[in-house]
Regions:
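Solvent-exposed beta-strand/loop surfaces of large extracellular or lumenal domains
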Residues: 20, 74-84
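C-terminal helical cap and adjacent loop that interface with cofactors, partners, or active-site loops
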Residues: 47-49, 62-67, 80-139
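Conserved short beta-strand edge segments in small beta-sheet-based binding/regulatory domains
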Residues: 68-73
């Protein structure tokens, strides 16, 4: 594209805004293709509104159903697409402060894009819509 972004990067930006319901959200993306058999991996940098305790962030991820924290950099333990292959869970690691921002957070996330990106996500979205009363469950 003329602005230097790829179509995949623009799609990721637009989808993030759409999912979060924030059309004005300032977000950027860099997408690269690497030779892995399956899976998507994302490096995420977030600037939070308020100061945070890193232990609280890690604890929140640990409590979230469907998320596996894999984060022990001293022992070279962090999520890789191979870890996520054939699994529904999202793997999160490299959870750390972004030293370039006052309330910045960095993390690395991987998932099996066929299992989580398509099939499982569709089921989870449907379940959430039923829970919110947006659609009715067929009995």
């Amino acid at each position: 594209l003329d602005n230097g972004y790829t179509k995949e990067e623009i799609k990721m930006i637009e989808e993030t805004r759409k999912i979060l319901g924030r059309p004005d959200l300032r977000v950027t993306a860099t997408c690269v293709r690497v030779p892995v058999r399956m899976g998507h991996a994302v490096s995420i940098n977030v600037e939070l509104e308020k100061p945070f305790d890193l232990k609280d962030v890690i604890e929140a991820f640990n409590k979230k159903e469907g998320v596996v924290v894999s984060d022990d950099v001293k022992n070279n333990v962090y999520p890789m697409p191979l870890d996520a292959a054939g699994k529904d869970e999202v793997f999160v690691g490299r959870i750390r402060r972004d030293e370039s921002l006052e309330n910045g957070l960095n993390l690395w996330v991987v998932a099996d894009n066929i299992r989580k990106g398509a099939a499982t996500n569709a089921v989870q979205i449907a379940e959430e819509l039923i829970k919110r009363g947006k659609v009715k469950d067929k009995e």
